[in-house]
A protein has these predicted regions:
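Residue-level signature of catalytic and energy-coupling elements of molecular machines
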Residues: 5, 18, 33, 45, ...
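Conserved phosphate-coupling serine/threonine residues in phosphotransfer and NTP-handling enzymes
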Residues: 110, 117, 201-203, 286
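Conserved cytosolic headpiece of P-type ATPases
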Residues: 1-12, 29, 36, 40-44, ...
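Short, well-ordered beta-strand core segments
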Residues: 150-151, 220, 281-283, 298
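Membrane-embedded alpha-helical bundles of multi-pass transporters
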Residues: 127, 195, 215, 238-259, ...
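Actuator/coupling domain of P-type ATPases
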Residues: 1-101, 178-179, 197, 304, ...
Length: 423
């Protein structure tokens, strides 16, 4: 549970790997340590979270750019405030000028601008880790909400990737390699949000089409060579860019059009180039280390519902960041003029430097409290995402050996090209 974020225990048999610091609930076991110290799973997770916390989200660049000019601007405002009150203010002019200038310097809070994004990112990374979603950077957290297409590997990602030793080998492979729990629900939730789903597979069209229809995948690209997945990701990106260029003359963009990023979900060594090529790489935690090192997000439990959790986490994080930035900007835009005495001609009231100091401190406290609200965010698959797939969906199946597409009900084509990077 500590690693996967799931409440139910995981059964282990002889020869299975176990994770240090997890709890043995029943029975006895003899273990052999294969990774110690910084190489253990927990240490790697802690290091990954620490590295992610040290990164900056792209939205932070706006705050950094404003903060760069903020202090000089406040100094200029304070000097102008002092000069205006000395020359035009009521007696005692010097006292009023000093009070207002000092109040401006005290109430101004550049720290609020600097803290707005990092606070939300830090809490969000912790929330994700608690739910089995490990993001390697703040940028990944920001981008996940803009996913428009999710490309899945088949074996080990959508399916279990394990065949029972007592299996009937006369049966088709899709009857031996069963679909993972949660795969149908995850695909249905993505489709309910208007996100396109694609499956990349090296399997024959018959096998790939059957699995795709079972989980509700929109499009299948089958018979892909082991080193050809990155090519198909790049092709999807080119198609997206061409479509965006054609619609560039439009006057408005819908919410669906703003979701343009392509995510790749995979678990194997052959998925690593595609994970790196995709706008957002999502690795299955039960897969290879190479895949996880190439990805932007790792799903520790291997459950594809983690993709929905990632998108929900991104939405919650960006909403919280916008709230924090709105508060930071609003506080300074309102507080600085009040401290400068803009209300004095109407109310005869000047802000005390002590009250200004209290307001400055409380502004940062409010940011911390708002960021901590993320701890209560629900990032699980919700009822609004739609019901789980019924398995009656029709998928478009495209063979990597043919440039033509065929409906799943009429699958044609076989791999004939020897070049891994050509369709």
């Amino acid at each position: 549970s500590m690693i996967t974020g799931e409440s139910k225990p995981v059964s282990k048999t002889a020869g299975d790997p176990v994770t240090g610091a997890t709890v043995l609930l029943k029975g006895d076991c003899v273990m052999r340590a294969t990774q110690v110290g910084a190489d253990t799973v927990l240490s790697q997770i802690a290091a990954m979270v620490a590295r992610a916390q040290a990164t900056k989200a792209p939205v932070q660049q706006l705050a950094d750019k404003i903060a760069r000019y903020f202090v000089p601007a406040v100094m200029i405002i304070a000097i102008w405030t002092f000069a205006i009150w000395v020359s035009l203010g009521p007696a005692p002019q010097l006292a009023h000028a000093l009070v207002t200038a000092v109040s401006v310097l005290i109430i101004a809070c550049p720290c609020a601008l600097g803290l707005a994004t990092p606070l939300s990112v830090t809490v969000s990374l912790g929330l994700g880790a608690t739910n089995g979603v490990l993001a390697t950077s703040a940028k990944a957290l920001e981008q996940a909400r803009r996913i428009g297409t999710v490309v899945f590997d088949k074996t080990g990602t959508i399916t279990r990737g394990v065949v029972d030793a007592a299996a009937d080998w006369d049966k088709p492979s899709y009857e031996q390699d069963t679909v993972k729990e949660g795969s149908r629900e995850a695909v249905a939730a993505l489709r309910a949000r208007g996100i396109r789903t694609v499956m990349l597979s090296g399997d024959k069209a018959e096998v790939a089409g059957r699995i795709a229809r079972e989980v509700g995948i929109d499009t299948v690209i089958c018979e892909v060579k082991p080193d050809g997945k990155a090519y198909w990701i790049a092709k999807l990106q080119r198609e997206r860019d061409e479509a965006a260029a054609k619609s560039a003359y439009g006057t408005s963009r819908t919410a669906a059009q703003s979701r343009t990023l392509i995510a790749m979900v995979g678990d194997g060594i052959n998925d690593a180039p595609a994970l790196a090529q995709a706008d957002l790489g999502i690795a299955i935690g039960t897969g290879t280390d190479v895949a996880m090192q190439s990805a932007d997000v790792t799903l520790m439990s291997g459950d594809l519902r983690g993709v929905i959790k990632t998108i929900n986490l991104s939405n919650a994080t960006m909403r919280n960041i916008r709230e924090n930035l709105g508060w930071a900007f609003g506080y300074n835009v309102i507080g600085i003029p009040v401290a400068a005495g803009v209300l004095y001609p109407f109310t005869g009231w000047l802000l005390s430097p002590m009250i200004a100091g209290l307001a400055m401190a409380l502004s940062s406290v409010c940011l911390v409290l708002n960021a901590n609200r993320l701890h209560g965010a629900n990032i699980n698959v919700g009822a609004a995402d739609g019901p789980a797939g019924s398995g009656s969906s029709t998928a478009d199946v495209e063979s990597a050996g043919s440039a033509e597409s065929a409906n799943a009900a009429n699958i044609t084509g076989s791999a004939t090209s020897n070049a891994p990077h050509e369709p």
